[in-house]
């Protein structure tokens, strides 16, 4: 719902007038009702606007979580005129992903969403079918394979070395910026072979374009008013904003492809080398966009939250550093071979993804036929929203300390498939989840192997801010500042 904060001030009164007019029209028509159906429980809704009055202006995922505490792990709400079912438990997510995944494999679509996804040529948003299966197959078999991973390991090692070498040791450092630059450079190099972080298109950098993409994906009027939302998007300037952004973003991706074709290398292969023979140009841009949007912010935020929790919990930091340093020998830098032996490191990454999953909700699913979940009826045209943030706090799975950062829980916890879903599940699960987690483990291991981390002068653990903000992505409200101190690995 963040998109509403970026709209002009005159638009809300216009929506109110339109709403009143529609309510009057609705009252003159007989209600069809839902006789004989057992819909999920939920809060009372108003005509036309549904439950928007309860959701706008607040932290969307926290508001939904509180409503789910009251109405249950499967809940029916209306976002505008759009019926939505929210699933907030592991057991019901399992039923959705396993029993009804084929019914819930599609998205809900709009004209602006079509623009943002290169005419639905991507993986994440394409209608489920032969095309989406082909795109996913190309990404997995040609890009995320063992042969390509050898090349990526070299890139990762070089980027980790560059990050460590350029840290201002002994000085208060903004790790949001450090991690953001690192992830942007690494992702760009595995996709194109070079960094485009500082390249500008009409004054906009790649990072600024990706930040804008997050805003544009955060919601739209078409999602809450499917029949006439496009009118409000045109009136508000939202459509023009999408078009302006996509002109810049398209030119950036075109530049990447053109420069790559001019400087191909037989020695070092990247994603364009691997996938281009099997994709047309629009498909290539769409899959590049998926990787950039899916990998950069997810990895960056996970690193920020992981380091925040590690520093906030000295016992965790000491235990983790002991494991890393006892397994590392005297190597200059660590790689995947080293981290494969570090059990507690894997617990820390899992707990970070559980406690601070980058996106509180999975991309909404569209129910295409009548099904039942948890004994409740879900009707065609309903948007099904998987509450990953709520599932990660499900007391039936995580007990009473679900809100605490406690990596040791995984020593005794048998993690079943849908106990946590930071990367989705079923047919639309993120294909790069294993690639992402392995890389995060390597980066964290190096940060804690060769560096001791201190709080900035004057800051105590009690004052350390762990507040969240955002809806499509949950970010740390204040940047993470720490002081890196070189650790003597030879001692």
From Swiss-Prot:
InterPro entries: Cyt_P450, Cyt_P450_CS, Cyt_P450_E_grp-I, Cyt_P450_sf. Its cofactor is heme. Involved in the biosynthesis of germacrene-derived sesquiterpene lactones. Hydroxylates 8-beta-hydroxy-germacrene A acid to 6-alpha,8-beta-hydroxy-germacrene A acid, which, in turn, undergo spontaneous lactonization to become eupatolide. Keywords: Heme, Iron, Membrane, Metal-binding, Monooxygenase, Oxidoreductase, Signal-anchor, Transmembrane, Transmembrane helix. The chain crosses the membrane at residues 7-27. It catalyses: 8beta-hydroxygermacra-1(10),4,11(13)-trien-12-oate + reduced [NADPH--hemoprotein reductase] + O2 = eupatolide + oxidized [NADPH--hemoprotein reductase] + 2 H2O. Heme binds at residue 430. It is found in: Membrane. One of its GO terms (biological process) is terpenoid biosynthetic process. It is an enzyme of class 1 (oxidoreductase). The keyword Transferase does not apply. Pathway: Secondary metabolite biosynthesis; terpenoid biosynthesis. It comes from Helianthus annuus (Common sunflower). PROSITE patterns: CYTOCHROME_P450. Its main location: membrane. Belongs to the cytochrome P450 family. This is Eupatolide synthase. One of its GO terms (molecular function) is eupatolide synthase activity.
């Amino acid at each position: 719902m963040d998109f509403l904060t970026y709209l002009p001030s005159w638009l809300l009164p216009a929506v109110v007038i339109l709403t009143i007019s529609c309510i009057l029209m609705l009252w003159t028509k007989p209600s069809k009702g839902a006789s004989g159906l057992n819909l999920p429980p939920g809060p009372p809704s108003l005509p036309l606007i549904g439950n928007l009055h309860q959701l706008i202006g607040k932290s969307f995922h926290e508001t939904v979580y509180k409503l789910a505490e009251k109405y249950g792990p499967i809940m029916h709400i209306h976002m505008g005129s759009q019926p939505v079912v929210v699933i907030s438990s592991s057991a019901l997510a399992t039923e959705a992903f396993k029993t009804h995944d084929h019914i819930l494999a599609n998205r809900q679509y709009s004209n602006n969403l079509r623009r943002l996804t290169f005419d639905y040529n991507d993986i994440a948003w394409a209608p489920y079918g032969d095309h989406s299966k082909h795109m996913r197959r190309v990404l997995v078999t040609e890009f995320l394979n063992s042969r390509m991973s050898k090349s990526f390991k070299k890139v990762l090692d070089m980027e980790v070395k560059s990050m460590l070498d350029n840290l201002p040791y002994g000085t208060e450092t903004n790790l949001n910026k450090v991690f953001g630059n690192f992830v942007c450079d690494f992702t760009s190099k595995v996709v194109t072979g070079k960094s485009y972080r500082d390249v500008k298109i009409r004054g906009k950098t790649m990072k600024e374009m990706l930040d804008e993409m997050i805003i544009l994906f955060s919601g739209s009027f078409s999602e809450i008013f499917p029949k006439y939302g496009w009118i409000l998007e045109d009136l508000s300037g939202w459509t023009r904003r999408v078009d302006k952004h996509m002109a810049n973003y398209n030119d950036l991706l075109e530049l990447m492809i053109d420069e790559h074709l001019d400087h191909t290398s037989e020695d070092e292969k990247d994603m364009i080398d691997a996938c281009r023979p099997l994709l047309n140009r629009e498909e290539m841009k769409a899959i590049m966009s998926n990787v950039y949007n899916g990998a950069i912010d997810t990895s960056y935020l996970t690193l920020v939250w992981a380091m925040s929790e590690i520093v906030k919990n000295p016992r965790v930091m000491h235990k983790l550093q002991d494991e890393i340093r006892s397994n590392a020998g005297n190597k200059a830098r660590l790689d995947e071979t080293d981290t494969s032996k570090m059990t507690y490191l894997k617990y820390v990454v899992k707990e970070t993804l559980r406690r601070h999953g980058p996106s509180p909700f999975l991309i909404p699913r569209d129910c295409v036929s009548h099904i039942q979940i948890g004994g409740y009826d879900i009707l065609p045209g309903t948007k099904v929203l998987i509450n990953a943030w709520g599932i990660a706090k499900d007391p039936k799975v995580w007990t009473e300390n679900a809100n605490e950062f406690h990596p040791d829980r995984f020593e005794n916890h048998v993690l079943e498939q849908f106990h946590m879903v930071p990367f989705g599940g079923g047919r639309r699960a993120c294909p790069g989840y294993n690639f992402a987690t392995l890389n995060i483990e390597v980066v964290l291991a190096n940060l804690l192997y060769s560096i001791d981390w201190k709080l900035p002068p004057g800051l105590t653990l009690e004052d350390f801010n762990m507040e969240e903000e955002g809806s499509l992505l949950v970010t740390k409200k204040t940047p993470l500042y720490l002081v890196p101190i070189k650790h003597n690995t030879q001692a």
